[in-house]
From Swiss-Prot:
Cofactor annotation comment: Binds 1 zinc ion per subunit.
Family note: Belongs to the class-I aminoacyl-tRNA synthetase family. MetG type 1 subfamily.
PANTHER family according to UniProt: METHIONINE--TRNA LIGASE, METHIONINE--TRNA LIGASE, CYTOPLASMIC
GO BP, sorted A to Z: methionyl-tRNA aminoacylation
Subunit structure: Homodimer.
Location of the protein in the cell: Cytoplasm
Chain positions of motif 'HIGH' region: 11-21
Domain of life: Archaea
Main localization of the protein described in the UniProt heading: cytoplasm
Role: Is required not only for elongation of protein synthesis but also for the initiation of all mRNA translation through initiator tRNA(fMet) aminoacylation.
EC annotation from Swiss-Prot or TrEMBL: 6.1.1.10
Swiss-Prot/TrEMBL keywords: Aminoacyl-tRNA synthetase, ATP-binding, Cytoplasm, Ligase, Metal-binding, Nucleotide-binding, Protein biosynthesis, RNA-binding, tRNA-binding, Zinc
Official protein name in the record: Methionine--tRNA ligase
Length: 722
């Protein structure tokens, strides 16, 4: 029996996941794996955070934090984001696991012992200003192949070619922006030319997407060169050699990161009490395992050339139980890029749909549905808010949701919620049952060919067929004159509903589960159709999907996108909505904070009302009701359930209060600790994301920056502010 080892590209633990990431490597893999599980296949789905990339060191340097603090924060955030998006990894690990250090060093030593490494003293990028060797990604310049400017020194994001700082045109330091120099430094290189012929023969036999196969073969034809696999960096896996010129150096992340697929698999099976089970997935023991890597287009060279070469360089794995070669990738489904409103996603300019923020406003199934319908399988595609709204409302709500609701409404209204017996079938009835069988076959074939967009379209065509069938049979009319005919119509409609409950599972797991609940089923879902028996009792109908409103989209843009990219948010709002509608939504959603929120995008906005030529006043008696006191922050912790909140403890002299404060974007924990602050002490306690807040810190907010209010000299804790 064939078994599947499925991976998604390891995300860098230096920032959150955006919709482009999800559509590229994670949602496609999840659809594929969920289908295999429904088929009863032997499949393991692995991923984890890549925690030694130079972007992590770069971010830590910029923020004055340690790399470990960065990776711990984003590992947890990314893991929770995937859970919320219903990405069903068997295990989500990390490359800071001890097993990953051990295995990565083992891979290096095996390649070293097998003669595939060579030490060379070469010129390495060095910044005279920052007094440090620069990893490739810390160097930016113009790509010599396509002329794209501001490309990092490891790969061009435009043409996809691997780069080195030496070949960049006008290279400069990404930290300070100054021109760089090159200094001598010893490093180990992998002799890629050792594997060129073997790689070519192997790739020619693989069932890869044409865009992947053609790109990779052309690179091999141009000639493979030696590539450095060690770096001058203080964060990463140490080079496992006792050589003077290797001290303080680490394994290059592009060498050790893909080894994470194996180390995370080992950790997974260790944790479930099967420490040797990983071998049948990663070692070619019986030729029955298919290793499938889901990636984005930018990762093609690393997974199709370098990663297989590392596995070849290791040679045979051998222990007391087994001796075997490593399994090479069976397939590498690589998606193209997703754009946002016609522009490339940009994390630096905050032009992105951050998944954890999007899921604060919209259900996971909505995001999964839309991203699947526009999935960039063979060409770049675009995320558009207007298209998102239309597709959800017309396809999910009006088509799928409407059909399920109609069928359940009729069985409850005319048959007390019991599946009726079928009478004699006519041609359309038989066509409906055949359509169900065809849908299972065709959707499965499309998924196995990584055509997820077409597969979902085929599922939705069954819902459309159901609506047409229902309209043609007109059970609202036959119910008055032909109970048997009506029963047949309702029975077959419910069979279609059950089929949809299974077919939707890979794409919309929440909707699938809800349909299963409404049908009152406890059987395990399988990728096969077994009819609902007559006499089975179903539940009363519930709304499956709610329409997306303009107000929701306006709120999302104002509350999330405008914080990081106010100009981009303003352009979006002006493109789709009247300003008065934006103002109305801001007032409804943000209340007294509406003007502050709106001024992020409309600098000239002013909402304060005037009465008889004078500003409205607050009465002194109302102000006097506030109990404002001086306190001192004595503890700062991350909120366990929110990305932007701290849980702080404030000493008010006679008591210590716990407060929840939205200051994470503006202050580091160490900047808050021991700071004197002003607290609203008699504010009604309120739970924020599951933690009670006993007051509020006062701060000034000009729409861009936030500054805490504090006394200009030390006073007694608990002193009143008058």
């Amino acid at each position: 029996m064939v078994r599947y080892m499925v991976t998604s590209a390891l995300p860098y633990a230096n920032g959150p996941i955006h919709a482009g990431h999800l559509a590229g490597a994670y949602l496609p893999a999840d659809i594929f794996v969920r289908y295999l599980r429904l088929k009863g296949e032997d499949v393991v789905f692995i991923c984890g955070t890549d925690e030694h990339g130079t972007p992590i060191s770069f971010r830590a340097l910029k923020e004055g934090r340690s790399p470990r603090e960065i990776v711990d924060e984003f590992h947890e955030q990314i893991k929770i984001t995937f859970q919320r998006a219903k990405i069903s990894f068997d295990f989500f690990g990390r490359t800071e696991l001890p097993i990953h250090y051990k295995l990565s060093q083992e891979f290096f030593l095996k390649a070293y012992e097998n003669g595939h490494l060579v030490k060379k003293v070469t010129k390495q990028a060095y910044c005279e200003h920052d007094k440090m060797f620069l990893p490739d990604r810390f160097v930016i310049g113009t790509c010599p192949y396509c002329g794209a400017e501001d490309q990092k020194g490891d790969q061009c994001e435009v043409c996809g070619r691997p780069l080195t700082p030496e070949i960049l045109i006008n290279p400069r330091c990404a930290i300070c922006g100054r021109p760089i120099s090159f200094r001598d430094s010893a490093h180990y290189y992998i002799k890629m030319q050792d594997f060129a012929e073997r790689l070519k023969r192997w790739i020619e036999k693989q069932p890869w997407k044409p865009n992947v196969k053609n790109m990779v073969l052309s690179w091999i034809e141009e000639g493979l060169e030696e590539r450095a696999i060690t770096r001058d960096l203080n964060w990463g896996i140490p080079v496992p050699l006792d050589e003077e010129d290797m001290k303080g150096k680490v394994l290059y992340v592009w060498f050790e990161a893909p080894i994470g697929y194996i180390s995370i698999t080992i950790e997974h099976f260790k944790r479930i009490g099967k420490p040797n089970e990983w071998k049948k997935y990663w070692l070619n023991i019986d030729g029955q395992t298919r290793v499938i890597h889901f990636i984005g287009k930018d990762n093609i060279p690393f997974h199709a050339i370098f990663w297989p070469a590392f596995l070849m360089a290791y040679g045979k794995y051998k222990d007391e139980e087994v001796e075997a070669e490593w399994n090479l990738p069976y397939d590498i489904p690589a998606n193209e890029y997703l754009t946002l409103e016609g522009k490339k996603f940009s994390t630096s300019r905050n032009w992105a749909i951050w998944v954890h923020e999007f899921l604060d406003v919209f259900p996971a199934d909505y995001l999964r549905y839309y991203l699947t319908t526009i999935m960039p399988e063979t060409r770049d595609s675009d995320f558009s808010f207007s298209d998102f709204k239309v597709r959800i409302n017309e396809e999910l709500v009006n088509n799928l949701g409407n059909f399920v609701h109609r069928a359940l409404t009729f069985v409850n209204r005319y048959f007390d919620g019991v599946v009726p017996e079928r009478g004699e079938l006519d041609e359309l009835d038989r066509e409906a049952l055949e359509e169900i069988e065809k849908a299972f076959k065709e959707v499965g074939e499309l998924i196995m060919n990584y055509r997820f967009k077409d597969a979902l379209k085929r599922v939705m065509s069954l819902a459309s067929f159901g609506n047409r069938y229902f309209d043609h049979k007109q059970p609202w009319k036959t119910a008055k004159e032909d109970k048997v005919r009506t029963g047949t119509t309702v029975n077959i409609s419910l069979q279609i509903v059950k089929a949809l409950g299974i077919l939707l599972e890979p794409f919309l797991p929440d909707a699938s589960e809800k349909i299963w609940h409404l049908l009152n089923l406890d059987e395990v879902k399988r990728w096969e159709f077994r009819e609902l028996p007559a006499g089975h009792k179903v539940r009363k109908p519930e709304i499956l999907f709610k329409k997306v409103t303009d107000d929701q989209i306006i709120y999302f843009i104002l509350n999330y996108m405008a914080k990081g990219n106010p100009e981009g948010a303003r352009i979006l709002l002006d493109k789709y909505y009247k300003r008065e509608d934006v103002i109305r939504v801001a007032k409804e959603k943000f209340g007294d904070e509406a003007e502050v929120v709106l001024r992020r995008v409309y600098k000239d906005i002013k909402l304060k009302e005037k009465k008889e030529g004078k500003e409205m006043y607050v009465k002194f008696d109302d102000f006097a009701k506030l109990d404002l006191r001086v306190g001192k922050i004595i503890e700062v912790k991350d909120h366990p359930n929110a990305d932007k909140l701290y849980v702080v403890k404030v000493d008010l002299g006679d008591e210590v209060r716990t407060l929840v404060a939205g200051l994470k974007k503006y202050y580091k924990p160490e900047e808050l600790l021991n700071r004197y602050v002003v607290v609203v002490a008699n504010l009604e306690p309120k739970k924020l994301r599951g933690i009670g807040s006993q007051g509020m810190l006062l701060a000034a907010d000009d729409g861009e920056r936030v500054a805490l209010l504090m006394p200009d000299k030390e006073v007694k804790l608990g002193a009143k502010v008058r």
